[in-house]
């Protein structure tokens, strides 16, 4: 997407053909910083400490991590060790495991001498595939926005609520939940996006609001608990969120707080859609609440908040009493029964085993 006069991806291969650059998202929206990842340790740190985040982008970053590893040691033992090291960084996002499996399955049959070049080629293919998947998701989600817009008065916006950041910053480009929004704007459909702040890391306030501003999308930042109120008063036409893991029966694991938005949407008759590329579907899991591991992140993310101080510096301040413990589950699971549809690159599926297999018959 464009930032100022430049088109950015969130991750790209450097001219040396070996290191990769990323947008370090910890500093947004106040500072756009680019960081170079040169080692597997760099990649693991970037994923674990959320320099990059969002299930698709985590997967792409891990794929490049495997490629970097192959330049140092292309052996089977090292390939397996790197798979384990990177897989442990963020356990909930299924794209991470998918990308690592894709890399290992591609490289294992190859002679060691050719693995490094092949690894970079495959990682780049995964990155390019992500862009195409998101573009297709956008086209399919745009149909939903068009349908709502057709019922509006001329110039009246489609009001969309989104949670966390499932934008281009969570992918290589376009985003999942935001791709239909960007395409609607490009088509001239009036929209207004309500952006949940998304505590505790404020990815809505820091990232989604920044994306909307950069792209010129009308939006309003709201506190996490305001969504239900807006729905009660008829101010939301549509909810679109992303997902870090979707089960074979249509349950969705997404940023903590998504479940509450789905409950409010169901109670108020607001359509609730989830946008996802197919690598986010875990076909081995059939009960999201019971089977998906939920990442527990450090309590300091709840107790402290980062922002720009009055002197212009970026500062972290404590907002809770010293000694008060904080729990920080990073995700929750929204049952399929609360979801209107799953927007994929192949179309919109009903959130059920039958609905998903209708779009992905190879999984029957």
Curated annotation (Swiss-Prot):
Residues at which substrate binds: 53-55, 90, 203, 254-255
GO MF term list: S-methyl-5-thioribose-1-phosphate isomerase activity
E.C. code: 5.3.1.23
Record: active site: 244 (proton donor)
One BP term from GO: L-methionine salvage from methylthioadenosine
Keywords for the protein's UniProt record, in alphabetical order: Amino-acid biosynthesis, Isomerase, Methionine biosynthesis, Plasmid
UniProt catalytic activity: 5-(methylsulfanyl)-alpha-D-ribose 1-phosphate = 5-(methylsulfanyl)-D-ribulose 1-phosphate
Pfam families: IF-2B
Pathway recorded for this protein: Amino-acid biosynthesis; L-methionine biosynthesis via salvage pathway; L-methionine from S-methyl-5-thio-alpha-D-ribose 1-phosphate: step 1/6
Superkingdom of the source species: Bacteria
Site (Transition state stabilizer) residue list: 164
Family named by the database record: Belongs to the eIF-2B alpha/beta/delta subunits family. MtnA subfamily.
Function statement: Catalyzes the interconversion of methylthioribose-1-phosphate (MTR-1-P) into methylthioribulose-1-phosphate (MTRu-1-P).
Stated name of the protein: Methylthioribose-1-phosphate isomerase
Organism from which the protein derives: Rhizobium meliloti (strain 1021) (Ensifer meliloti)
Source taxonomy: Bacteria, Pseudomonadati, Pseudomonadota, Alphaproteobacteria, Hyphomicrobiales
Gene name as annotated: mtnA
């Amino acid at each position: 997407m464009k930032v100022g006069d430049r088109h950015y991806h969130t991750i790209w291969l450097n001219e040396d053909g070996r290191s990769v650059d990323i947008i370090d998202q910890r500093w947004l929206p106040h500072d756009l910083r680019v960081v170079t990842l040169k080692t597997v340790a760099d990649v693991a740190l970037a994923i674990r400490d959320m320099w990059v985040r969002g299930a698709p982008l985590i997967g792409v970053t891990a794929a490049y991590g495997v490629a970097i590893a192959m330049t140092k040691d292309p052996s089977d033992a090292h390939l397996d060790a790197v798979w384990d090291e990177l897989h442990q960084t963020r356990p909930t996002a299924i794209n991470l495991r998918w990308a690592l499996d894709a890399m290992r399955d591609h490289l294992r049959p190859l002679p060691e001498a050719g693995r490094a070049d092949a690894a970079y080629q495959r990682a780049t293919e995964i990155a390019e595939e992500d862009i195409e998947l998101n573009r297709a998701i956008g086209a399919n989600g745009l149909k939903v926005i068009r349908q709502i817009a057709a019922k509006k008065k001329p110039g009246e916006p489609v009001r969309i609520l989104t949670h966390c950041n499932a934008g281009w910053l969570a992918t290589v480009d376009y985003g999942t939940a935001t791709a239909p929004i960007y395409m609607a704007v490009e088509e001239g459909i009036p929209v207004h996006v309500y952006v949940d702040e998304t505590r505790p890391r404020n990815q809505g306030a820091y990232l989604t609001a920044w994306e909307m501003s950069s792209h010129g999308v009308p939006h309003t930042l709201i506190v996490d608990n305001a969504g239900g109120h807006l729905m009660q008063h008829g101010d939301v036409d549509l909810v679109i969120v992303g997902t870090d893991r979707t089960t074979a029966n249509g349950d969705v694991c997404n940023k903590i707080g998504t479940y509450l938005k789905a409950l409010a949407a169901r109670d108020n008759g607001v359509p609730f859609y989830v946008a996802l590329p197919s690598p986010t579907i875990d076909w081995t899991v059939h009960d999201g609440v019971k089977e998906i591991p939920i990442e527990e992140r450090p309590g300091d993310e709840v107790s402290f908040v980062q922002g720009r101080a009055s002197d212009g510096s970026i500062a972290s301040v404590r907002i809770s009493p010293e000694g008060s413990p904080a729990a920080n589950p990073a995700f929750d699971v929204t049952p399929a029964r609360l979801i209107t549809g799953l927007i994929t690159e192949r179309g919109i599926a009903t959130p059920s085993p039958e609905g998903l297999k209708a779009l992905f018959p190879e999984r029957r």
